[in-house]
A protein has these predicted regions:
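General secretory precursor processing signal
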Residues: 19-21, 27, 111, 116-119, ...
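Short glycine-rich, low-complexity/disordered patches
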Residues: 140-151, 239-244
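Mixed-charge, low-complexity intrinsically disordered segments
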Residues: 162-200
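Alpha-helix-centered segments that form part of catalytic cores
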Residues: 124-135, 141-142, 190-201
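N-terminal targeting sequences that direct proteins away from the cytosol to non-cytosolic compartments
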Residues: 2-106, 183-194, 202-207, 211-244
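Secretory pathway targeting signatures of secreted, lumenal, and periplasmic proteins
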Residues: 62-136, 147-156, 161-167, 172
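Second-shell loop/turn segments in exported
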Residues: 118-121, 144-145, 215-222
Length: 244
């Protein structure tokens, strides 16, 4: 990532030498003394890595979960969850997690989010494969994908939620599975029909990066919902800088 890239360029002049002794005479002007010119690119500011767990200080952090690193800016009061997401409680409902921004890689999407056991399909690493699988998923509703830029890289954004009145307790393993890192168990599921997500799926030159912001219940504090969206929007990838 450009913010971490440090490159130093050194340019050295070529010395003029006499190739044949017969061509060098006392009458000729002496060859210039060798010189060396050095240009140094000042190192760019290096961002701290996002802590793996616990309360984190407000600021901008670097995350290395994907093919390219990304930056995320976090206000006060957020907690890091295993380095794969950030959560914050709703002050109006302190017993429940209010919002979450996640980004762990998932390579499997079930054809049916409720009857998901045996239907987890392995995906190729492209962004399109994940978007197509999610928007075609049975038992869920998705908005049409909209093209976005996530820093210097293109992607798409769409909303995702439970379709209709699904009895989640009756789903396989009591989980409403939307995607997973594995073929035989679920690593991202809804616990209630009230959960709502917005996804951004980024194309990193043929490789996928994916992010989602979650609202866990309908009566979420509006200020907290706006704050979660701001954290989600702060995620950016930057092209590596090239010096010449």
């Amino acid at each position: 990532m450009g913010v971490l890239l440090r490159r130093f360029i050194s340019m050295t002049s070529v010395l003029s030498v006499c190739l044949g002794l017969s061509a060098c005479t006392a009458a000729e002007a002496p060859a210039p003394a060798p010189t060396t010119e050095t240009r140094t690119v000042p190192p760019m500011h290096t961002l701290p890595p996002l802590p793996d767990s616990g309360d984190i200080d407000p600021g901008t952090y670097l995350v290395t979960s994907f093919k390219e690193n990304f930056e995320i800016t976090v206000p006060d009061g957020w907690v890091s969850e295993d380095g794969d997401g950030l959560g914050k409680d709703d002050p109006d409902q302190p017993d429940d997690l209010g919002v979450f921004v996640g980004w762990w890689p998932s390579n499997h999407v079930p054809r049916d989010a409720c009857k998901w056991q045996g239907s987890l399909v392995e995906l190729n690493p492209s962004a399109k494969a994940f978007v197509d699988a999610m928007t075609a998923q049975t038992s869920t509703a998705s908005t049409p994908p909209v093209e976005v830029m996530v820093g210097d890289y293109p992607g798409v954004e769409f909303d995702h939620s439970v379709e209709g009145d699904v009895d989640i307790k009756a789903c396989d393993n009591g989980q409403f599975c939307v995607h997973s890192e594995y073929s035989n168990l679920c690593t991202r599921w809804y616990s209630s029909t009230a959960e709502r997500e917005t996804y951004r799926v980024v194309n990193l030159d043929g490789h996928r990066a994916m992010f989602w912001v979650v609202q866990f219940h309908e009566s979420i504090n509006p200020e907290l919902a706006r704050e979660a969206r701001a954290v989600f929007d702060s995620i950016v990838f930057k092209l590596r800088e090239v010096s010449s």
